[in-house]
Design a protein with these regions (language model features):
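Conserved alpha-helical substructure of the radical SAM core
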Residues: 67-99
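Canonical Radical SAM [4Fe-4S] cluster-binding loop centered on the CxxxCxxC motif
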Residues: 49-79
Length: 363
């Protein structure tokens, strides 16, 4: 099998790992697998996302690479993937590498090959850009440390919000030891780009389960991002007949995550709009505003913390309103980046407003 054939197989196999919200990941169709435009923090980065090896001894019931699943097997040698990546950097303007692997044999053996590949890219090919290194569950501390010295960001996929659900998904991963312990190691190593993780969203968990774990990860481990992957059944896996998770659920989890990370909302506030542990179908910020606003907020008297709780006003717009000393009319709010239609039922300007809370369709 030549390198191009491997790239198609291993690049396609790497699509299940997130390097950004799925709605912000766009695969580049160029006949070569694994190249994505990933958008994060208002910037777009072209990433080569691939596995080193798609053979795996783990038994994850949702994964096409799991032991026992039939597939086209392929693996890179370290020099091979480093050389391919160098070619992509020089010819396709790829700016970063996202490297993961199946666990063929044991985690340390697989990780050693990944480290060697990144080391070659850094030394022989003098790549100084972004590397996201996927830490495999069960990897030894010494190898995690070595990988951290070559990487900008690292991640271990927790996949589930707690150990009981993990047991339903995989019989060979110890949630506390193989996963959470590795996350603690990464946290203490202090990477410039920090660490992230991913959870699979399916019917085994509620939104309350998921957000409770995300909140813990942000608070205790100082994670930069938690990514949410709506479950998609894969043919040939034990869960192939389970129903897919609606993307609307994934999106509402992202909305709620942003509220906790960027807007200062507390987890317990989100609990207030849940029904049997599930978020409403509408935007959670809008649902919270409907539940908590008992009077309109005057834009010229409000603090930054109050402004960002108004639907249609984000952190950037709120900061601009404060810096400008307020606004005089709705058209000015629009020019500053506010979504006037959504915000207007909840606001007034200098004590004046044009509508009641129920007068507008703000969905």
């Amino acid at each position: 099998m030549n390198t191009l054939e491997k790239a198609r197989i291993l690049g396609d196999a790497g699509r299940y790992d997130s390097c950004g919200p799925k709605a912000c990941e766009v695969k580049v169709e160029n006949g070569l697998g694994g190249i994505y435009h990933a958008k994060a923090e208002h910037k777009t980065c072209r990433i080569f996302k691939t596995l080193m090896d798609n053979s795996c001894s783990f038994d994850c019931r949702y994964c096409s690479n799991a032991a026992g699943c039939s597939k086209n097997k392929a693996s890179y040698e370290p020099e091979e993937v480093a050389g391919l990546f160098d070619y992509l950097v020089k010819n396709l303007a790829v700016e970063g590498l996202f490297l993961s692997s199946g666990v063929s044999g044991n985690p340390d053996k697989a990780t050693e090959k990944m480290i060697e590949a990144v080391k070659i890219a850094r030394t022989k090919y003098r790549f100084r850009g972004y590397v996201h290194f996927k830490v495999l569950p069960g990897t030894s501390y010494e190898l995690v440390k070595q990988a951290s010295e070559l990487s900008n960001r690292m991640s271990v996929n927790i996949e589930a919000p707690n150990s009981s659900i993990m047991q339903e998904l995989s019989g060979c991963k110890d949630y506390s030891i193989d996963i959470l312990r590795r996350q603690r190691w990464i946290s203490k190593l202090g990477l410039g780009g920090g660490q992230s993780t991913q959870m699979i969203i399916n019917d085994m968990s509620t939104d309350k389960d998921v957000l409770k774990m995300s909140d813990w990860e942000y608070e205790k481990l100082d994670l930069r991002r938690v990514y949410y992957a709506a479950f998609r059944p894969v043919k040939g896996t034990p869960l192939e007949n389970e129903k897919a998770t609606p993307l609307t659920r994934q999106n509402r989890l992202y909305n709620s995550d942003f509220l906790m990370r960027d807007y200062g909302y507390k987890l317990k506030e989100l609990y207030e709009i849940m029904d049997e542990g599930m978020l409403p179908r509408e935007d959670p910020k809008l649902a919270l505003a409907k539940a908590t606003f008992d009077r309109p907020l005057d834009l010229n008297e409000a603090s930054y913390e109050e402004l960002i709780r108004v639907p249609g006003i984000g952190p950037k717009t709120a900061k601009t309103i404060i810096l400008n000393g307020g606004v005089k009319k709705y058209e000015e709010l629009h020019k500053l980046g506010g979504w006037v239609k959504r915000a207007r039922p909840f606001i007034e300007i200098n004590g004046k407003r044009q509508s009641m809370l129920g007068d507008f369709d703000v969905a």
